[in-house]
A protein has these predicted regions:
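Short coil/turn segments at secondary-structure boundaries
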Residues: 44-48, 61, 65, 77-81
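Conserved ATP-dependent adenylate/AMP-binding module captured primarily in the ANL superfamily
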Residues: 1-14, 54-76, 107-109
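Conserved pre-ATP/AMP-binding loop-to-beta segment of ANL
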Residues: 17-35, 68-73
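Glycine/alanine-rich phosphate-binding loops at beta-alpha junctions
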Residues: 6-16, 20, 39, 43
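Short, charge-rich binding segments
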Residues: 38, 62-71, 82-83, 91-94
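AMP-binding/adenylate-forming
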Residues: 50-55, 74-109
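Conserved AMP-binding A3 loop
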Residues: 31-58
């Protein structure tokens, strides 16, 4: 069995946020708070249940055609971790015990 691991580039500045989410996950928190992007109105906080996050992680895993026999994956997170895309990369790494390496997002799409 492999274990989750997070690593960070020297210019990544959201390590405190990542560590907070890791702690929540590892202590079996059932609710997680994320801010919406604010693309259609003012950003707001939303609550996401652990079960919903696991469901999403499992569906993404299946959609990408990953095999359960793979005992370790490493992923690079270059998305803002406080937004949905980067946050879900972190959740998938936690759920599947992957190694995730964070670098700062350098562009805003």
């Amino acid at each position: 069995m492999t274990h989750f691991k997070a690593s960070y580039s020297e210019h990544f500045h959201d390590q405190d946020y990542v560590e907070k989410v890791i702690h929540q996950w590892q202590t079996d928190s059932q609710l997680f708070v994320l801010s919406t992007s604010g693309s259609t109105e003012k950003p707001k906080k939303i609550q996401l249940s652990r079960n919903m996050l696991i469901w999403s992680a499992e569906k993404t895993y299946a959609a990408l055609g990953l095999q359960k026999k793979q005992n370790q994956l490493s992923v690079l997170c270059c998305l803002p971790v406080q937004k949905t895309g980067g946050f879900m990369q972190l959740i998938r790494a936690l759920h599947f015990n992957w190694h995730i390496h964070f670098i700062p997002a350098t562009a805003n799409p």
